[in-house]
């Protein structure tokens, strides 16, 4: 009798050992079987007791790296950790029954998820790329902290580039459940037995990588509820994380602004070139081409928008307009410089204004003309006396005496070879003969004097036109330089005074930062 009983006992023990979930399982496996097999857990059902109940889902965001902001694509790339928290009453257990296990780490495809996605993503991927484990506590509290690299859309305001700041946001909501099924909120923490919502983007100083182009000014988090949208719509509520970032302009100042300003101010050197220099126009056109190249480079760096003109674009356009005017001025100056009395007449009003009034106002100096001194007058009168004596001498001497005067004196010859010409008996005849002989010389001298007088007048008139061109050059220098300085300062001071707001939201004095917690 004892044999059959012993055999039956051994068979029963083998059957019990063969049953799943009996022996050979650790406490976690036994707990998982208890939750998912024995209690019949269904991940497709919301963790609520009744249909009208809502699931409270709390969110927080930890920023580990602001990777880049591509202005052309209007895309913000960030490396974040998005923290989900909710309560699933079906995943509760008594820790004493399962070896004091208080937390389980489960794959996310085993439990219910609220399906929170980034609405304003820019790559069409709504799901989180890396599905890390879900932490389930014995009270039913569930947390899920998956890492993600988000490419979110960020509208770019290029008005004050490169002294701009941008307001980029990450908008999270559930595309599967409406406001009647889940309630979104900000995650809460406790401090001194008091709880407060995390109304900011969390940044771990040890794990955060600073961006070389942008600095974070504000990082607020806010729950947005739109009462005008029905609750059965997925757009009724969302949790938005705002990143207000300011550009670090040093790179653009060194590589774009300083070269642009230096090239633009080179246009003032055109007015220091001589009026007859044809390179005046060449220099101005070279500056214009350089500005066009910089404008082309900037247009490739910014989005193609017609909403606003960037600050550096305004400066380049201002400089190009000014340089175009300088080119026109150079052509006018060259035209004035090469004018002559035979083609243009310089009126007295223009002469007085450009040769007397403006040069005094512009502090221009003109070489003074040398006045004939008394010595020159004495020299001229003595020369006239010598000429008269020479004419009288030559009229009384015969030609042979004039030719052999020195030889006759040397050989002691006192007798003339030819009889000297006797002066006429009548003075009227003498004057008539002298007049007839000297008339051609006088006419030639008068012609030379008149020609020299006309030539001097011509040259003087031409010099006056040159002086007018020089005065116009100096006047344009005195006009263009202040306009360039004032215009440059006015344009760039707009960017210097373009600062982000002191608070994240206009009209809201709250700073939404760790230093300004709002306890509940």
UniProtKB/Swiss-Prot annotation:
The keyword Lyase does not apply. Disulfide bonds join 154-168. It is found in: Postsynaptic cell membrane; Cell membrane. After binding acetylcholine, the AChR responds by an extensive change in conformation that affects all subunits and leads to opening of an ion-conducting channel across the plasma membrane. One of its GO terms (molecular function) is acetylcholine-gated monoatomic cation-selective channel activity. The modification Phosphotyrosine is found at residue 393. This is Acetylcholine receptor subunit delta. GO terms for cellular component: acetylcholine-gated channel complex; neuromuscular junction; plasma membrane; postsynaptic specialization membrane. InterPro entries: Neur_chan_lig-bd (IPR006202), Neur_chan_lig-bd_sf (IPR036734), Neur_channel (IPR006201), Neuro-gated_channel_TM_sf (IPR036719), Neuro_actylchol_rec (IPR038050), Neurotrans-gated_channel_TM (IPR006029), Neurotransmitter_ion_chnl_CS (IPR018000), Nicotinic_acetylcholine_rcpt (IPR002394). Glycans are attached at residues 100, 167, 193. Belongs to the ligand-gated ion channel (TC 1.A.9) family. Acetylcholine receptor (TC 1.A.9.1) subfamily. Delta/CHRND sub-subfamily. It comes from Mus musculus. The chain crosses the membrane at residues 249-273, 281-299, 315-336, 475-493. Residues 1-24 form the signal peptide. It catalyses: K(+)(in) = K(+)(out); Na(+)(in) = Na(+)(out). Residues 337-474 are cytoplasmic. The gene is Chrnd. Pentamer of two alpha chains, and one each of the beta, delta, and gamma (in immature muscle) or epsilon (in mature muscle) chains. The muscle heteropentamer composed of alpha-1, beta-1, delta, epsilon subunits interacts with the alpha-conotoxin ImII. Residues 25-248 are extracellular. One of its GO terms (biological process) is skeletal muscle tissue growth.
